[in-house]
Amino acid sequence: MNVRDEGKTTAEKHGGGEENKSPENKWRFNSPLAQVSLMGFVCFCCPGMFNALSGMGGGGQVDPTAANNANTAVYTAFTVFGLLGGGFYNVLGPRLTLAAGCSTYVLYAGSFLYYNHHHHQAFAIVAGALLGCGAGLLWAGEGAVMTSYPPPHRKGTYIALFWSIFNLGGVIGGLIPFILNYQRSSAASVNDSTYIAFMCFMFAGVLLSFGILPATSVIRNDGSRCSAVKYSRPSTEAAAVLRLFLDRKMLLIVPAAWASNFFYSYQFNNVNGLLFNLRTRGFNNVFYWGAQMAGSIAIGYVMDFSFKSRRARGFTGISLVAVIGTIIWAGGLANQHGYSLDKLPEKKLDFKDSGIEFAGPFVLYMSYGLLDAMYQSMVYWLIGALADDSQTLSRYSGFYKGVQSAGAAVAWQVDTRKVPLMSQLIVNWSLTTVSYPLLVLLVYFYVKNDNDDDSNDKV
């Protein structure tokens, strides 16, 4: 049976009629493809550029302390608003939620432009706290769109599409400091033009967010609609979010959520930041985020097409990420034996001048990006397999991002307090390793095959 025939069957299950007829125009603004793609470009402009800025190590500054403290503020606030973001999304709808979230990214980049001249941390820390609030809103909206708008049997493909567009922002964001600081091979911090360019992209993200449609306006190619959401009162949403702490499905995801951003401070500050000079950090980030695009596409294919059984695809995806993750972290262990905070490299690596010495750390850093995308895309696929309506999934995504941010807030302070680099690496490796068997249990007990019941036909 082809895809079109499947769509007709789905429509018939829900009564047929005009509402469930397949749209004649497959290239529509209200299609899941257009909406997920637009969501990708919103994140391209805002968190994509934020990732590129963070990936410079220390926010592009010679001393990472201000950036570490600002990031701690970001993720502390994100912990709260990540949990509540689904409630805001369900009350405000996608456009207001996303626009409010995106606007805080512009302020954050502007705070580092200010810091470039005045070296006062207060503005960066306050802007970081506001960004944490905004990021909670943005990612709750993103999670609902990405996991509930696509058809159930193609969620991995749409996650890969989103992740590729989103991480293209990191690629372009890596090119910005690389190009604007190319002739400054001995510079310690990026110039003003770099921060201004980031701010322009982030403001574009604010404008794009107004194009995201509510779930009830999105029509799939088979004529089915996404689950209609009856927006709830804040008190109702607060109670629903609190109940997630007793939800066994969410408890099994907690270690993966905690681990999924914990390693950023180590990778950005202590691999890219300590081993490479300024312009090479931007060069490296192009490939770090480019590898994320490849990783998301690869794992998306596995999670959607490797086996007919959804559960088998889940087990296969987790196993593949576990094997690749073990290999990459083992490579990181070998690399970490070469330096420490007490014994830093005498000269930082340059992509043009360091020759073969540059290759090993560069490939490792790029591999970290590959693993990050595979790991997070896998977890998002699992979350998407637990439900099909945007209200539930916005809460699940908000819970995931909230726990993720709590871990990141701790990680940035771990780095600020100069914890030995080898200890940081071992903790990062251990956290991801612990999460794999728990995700296997999640699939075993709570992920159902497409034909187990009719829940996956919900429209």
UniProtKB/Swiss-Prot annotation:
An example Gene Ontology CC term for this record: membrane
Keyword match Membrane: yes
Matches recorded under Pfam families: UNC-93
InterPro entries: Ion_channel_UNC-93, MFS_trans_sf, UNC-93-like_regulator
Keywords: Membrane, Transmembrane, Transmembrane helix
Keyword GTP-binding annotated: no
Topology class, membrane: Multi-pass membrane protein
Residues covered by region (Disordered): 1-26
Transmembrane segments: 38-58, 73-93, 96-116, 122-142, 159-179, 195-215, 251-271, 287-307, 314-334, 355-375, 425-445
Predominant localisation class: membrane
SUPFAM superfamilies linked to this entry: MFS general substrate transporter (SSF103473)
Domain of life: Eukaryota
Subcellular location: Membrane
Family: Belongs to the unc-93 family.
Name of the molecule in the record: UNC93-like protein 1
Organism from which the protein derives: Arabidopsis thaliana (Mouse-ear cress)
Lineage: Eukaryota, Viridiplantae, Streptophyta, Embryophyta, Tracheophyta
